[in-house]
């Protein structure tokens, strides 16, 4: 993926211009080389630095460079041949720096095993191996190879725009719900994910609590109150039982069960241990609805048992009731008796006469009947204690 300075065995043509015009001085005095205007010409091939006396050959130049199959074919010192691009023989190599030239050539010469390394590639941008590369779509060349190919151009060519493999971190979290975590309680599993005001994830419980109360949900659950009948370590000071419906305290402040506390309250002495029972005895209370129905039925029966026949006992009781309720004097009793007798006689003599009854007082005044309106007015005037009858 990244270019190195490793050069494959397929070497390019000679990278210098051996014409006499390129030297600053004459060739006999000092052979100082002046580089040409090409950028990567010095990096493509420095094969003339070999320490041998024979001149180095150059490969033929095509539109692209082909990789050599063996090292011996590309570096053949015994058979010099000229380049097809330049029509003049190459300059002889320098003999005065053989030791230094050998060090340079050893670092830049590629062995036969280096041509199959994954980082080595030819100048045309393709790999030497005949296997199909799996990263080929990302390393495709941006422009086709030309006759001016070199290492510098290919190093710039391979640096294209990186291919985005995955999106932003927020999108990845949305696609992977198991990676979410509640910022309040730390839960990773919830039937519904919610968000707080800042956009952080909350579980369903914390989100609802925050929405309803406006506060963060408390992390510590409140301890449930232990029932009084099952409090750990609590026992009756008298019978030593630990099960009761109600805990009480004796005069000394010690906890006692309901039975011992009631016994001490009623009798003033501690409850004897012989009365202790394993189970809790409760009373069988009758429902209150049955008691109400019975009382209403008894009241109805008593009201229907009142006799409607006019007798002296009823008249006397009625007169007694009137006297107790606030009669002005005791002289009204014979007046009431005489009026009742006169009404009974008129009923027996004239049965077809008009009768007047007071509604709502049939039980008390069922025998009172007057024949005319004048008698009604006279009776009302005489009986001052019956002023409520006009209401």
UniProtKB/Swiss-Prot annotation:
One of its GO terms (cellular component) is nucleus. In embryos, expressed in the presumptive heart mesoderm. In adults, expressed at high levels in heart, small intestine, and stomach and at lower levels in lung, pancreas and colon. A zinc finger (GATA-type) spans 182-206, 236-260. The keyword Transit peptide does not apply. The keyword Lyase does not apply. One of its GO terms (molecular function) is zinc ion binding. Gene3D superfamilies: Erythroid Transcription Factor GATA-1, subunit A (3.30.50.10). Residues 96-111, 326-355 have a biased composition (Polar residues). Keywords: Activator, DNA-binding, Metal-binding, Nucleus, Repeat, Transcription, Transcription regulation, Zinc, Zinc-finger. It holds the Pfam family GATA. Residues 66-83, 292-319 have a biased composition (Low complexity). Its main location: nucleus. Residues 282-291 have a biased composition (Basic residues). It is found in: Nucleus. Residues 57-111, 274-355 are annotated as: Disordered. GO terms for biological process: cell fate commitment; epithelial cell differentiation; negative regulation of transcription by RNA polymerase II; positive regulation of transcription by RNA polymerase II. Transcriptional activator that binds 5'-GATA-3'-containing motifs within gene promoters. Regulates cardiac-specific transcription during embryogenesis and thereby cardiogenesis. This is GATA-binding factor 6-A.
């Amino acid at each position: 993926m990244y270019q190195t300075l490793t050069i494959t065995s397929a070497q390019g043509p000679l990278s210098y211009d051996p014409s006499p015009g390129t030297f600053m001085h004459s060739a006999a005095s000092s052979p100082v080389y002046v580089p040409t205007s090409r950028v990567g010409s010095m990096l493509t091939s420095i094969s003339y630095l070999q320490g041998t006396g024979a001149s180095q050959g150059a490969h033929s130049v095509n539109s692209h460079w082909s990789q050599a199959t063996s090292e011996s074919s590309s570096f053949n010192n015994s058979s010099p041949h000229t380049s097809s691009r330049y029509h003049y023989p190459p300059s002889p190599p320098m003999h005065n720096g053989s030791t230094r030239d050998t060090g340079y050539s050893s670092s830049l010469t590629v062995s036969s095993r280096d041509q199959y390394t994954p980082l080595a590639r030819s100048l045309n941008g393709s790999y030497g191996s005949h296997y199909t590369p799996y990263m080929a779509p990302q390393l495709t060349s941006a422009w086709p190879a030309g006759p001016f190919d070199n290492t510098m151009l290919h190093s710039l060519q391979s640096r294209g725009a990186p291919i985005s493999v995955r999106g932003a971190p927020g999108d990845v979290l949305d696609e992977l719900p198991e990676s979410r975590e509640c910022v309040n309680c730390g839960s990773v599993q919830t039937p519904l994910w919610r968000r707080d005001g800042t956009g952080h994830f909350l579980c369903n419980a914390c989100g609802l609590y925050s929405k309803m109360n406006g506060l963060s949900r408390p992390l510590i659950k409140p301890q449930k109150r232990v029932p009084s009948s099952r409090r750990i370590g609590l026992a009756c000071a008298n019978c030593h039982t630990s099960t009761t419906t109600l805990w009480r305290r004796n005069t000394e402040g010690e906890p006692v069960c309901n039975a011992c506390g009631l016994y001490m309250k009623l009798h003033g002495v501690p409850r004897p241990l012989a009365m202790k029972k394993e189970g809790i005895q409760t009373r069988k209370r009758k429902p209150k609805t049955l008691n109400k129905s019975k009382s209403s039925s008894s009241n109805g029966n008593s009201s229907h048992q009142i006799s409607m026949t006019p007798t002296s006992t009823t008249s006397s009781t009625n007169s007694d009731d009137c006297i107790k309720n606030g009669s002005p004097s005791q002289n009204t009793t014979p007046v009431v008796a005489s009026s009742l007798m006169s009404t009974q006689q008129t009923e027996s003599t004239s049965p077809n006469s008009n009768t007047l009854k007071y509604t709502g007082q049939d039980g008390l005044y069922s025998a009172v009947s007057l024949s005319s309106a004048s008698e009604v007015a006279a009776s009302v005037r005489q009986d001052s204690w019956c002023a409520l009858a006009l209401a």
